[in-house]
UniProtKB/Swiss-Prot annotation:
Highest taxon of the lineage: Eukaryota
Transmembrane segments: 3-23, 47-67, 81-101, 105-125, 128-148, 153-173, 177-197, 220-240, 253-275, 293-313
Protein name per UniProt: NADH-ubiquinone oxidoreductase chain 2
Record InterPro entries: Complex_I_Subunit_2 (IPR050175), NADH_UbQ_OxRdtase_chain2 (IPR003917), ND/Mrp_TM (IPR001750)
Amino acid sequence: MMIWIITISILVSLSSNSWFIFWLMMEINMMSFIPIMNDFKMKNYNSMITYFIIQSFSSSLFFISSFQYSLFNMELFFSLINISVLIKLGMIPFHFWLIMISESLTFYSLLILLTIQKIIPLLIIEKFMNSLMIPLFIMSSLLASIMAMKYKLIKQILIFSSISHQGWILCLIAKKMNFWVSYLMLYSIIIYSIIINCKEMNFNKLCDLTKKKISSKMKNTMIMSMMSLAGMPPFIGFFMKIMAIFFLMKMNLIFMMILIISSLINLFFYLRILTPLFFINSKFSIWSFNNMKSNFMIKINMLLLIILINIFF
């Protein structure tokens, strides 16, 4: 029921240009997500309260700033609108609340938080973009990559990975590139595969992989998904990054280099996750024809690659 309300709120936002409608849909979105977080554990109640307080504060800031901007058209209020949305997205330096609630989130609620819940704030950023925020987006992407290296909980690593990818998406939005929609969709498909596998394997910490017996098919799918998220060729994540670089070529060269460096750092902590997988059931070859034939993620990668080539070439 709640997921349908969230979907409707997103569809209404897609068809609106009014800041008031955006604000109203964000509130509906927030109130619909809170019951999804609830699994009747004390940790979850604390997380729900934290989420509610942060989202209420950012929504209030957005409402007041938008109202004042519509009256006085001052740059200060325009910047505050952007800041309020960045708080909702959990971009650095406003990411602390995401880390606080991450441990108590279920994999299902984490998936929604990292994908669907970002759509309305990103639509608002597209309407109220301040180009002065671009350096913040880029530094947020870099810092998220660096900070992820000290964490060992998979949910926290995925959150920092999401923040890093958000930096790319926000830069695409800042440059008025509609490719950000495709980037978000491809990222959502990849992260869906990873989170579903983590849930099936009950994978919460990096050390868990060395203690669990994992089926070859599941291991293979996880490796493919992580390599795609890392942007390794020939997976769809690589072409996603290449297309983003192509569209951002006109941006400041230093900024572009920082984004690429952040992706290379991301590759390091993705490899931290992948390394144990390569040594589980080592007799299994991930490139064997039978396993490739049955592997869902390979089919998805091939399909998305064909679609991407047809769209852009």
